[in-house]
């Protein structure tokens, strides 16, 4: 299997309305897909996509 076609763990860091830093974890092919998944599964991120301040690949 091609290594580029494997899912990798990503942590999406974001800040809520009180400026508290939170995180959500997803398996995705790249950071853009991790962002898309975060927006799909997290209502706050969906409504405030600019609250994301870091997307880190954990491998």
Spans of features found by a protein language model:
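Terminal low-complexity, poorly structured segments
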Residues: 3, 18, 33-35, 50
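A structural detector for beta-sheet-dominated domains
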Residues: 15, 29, 55-58
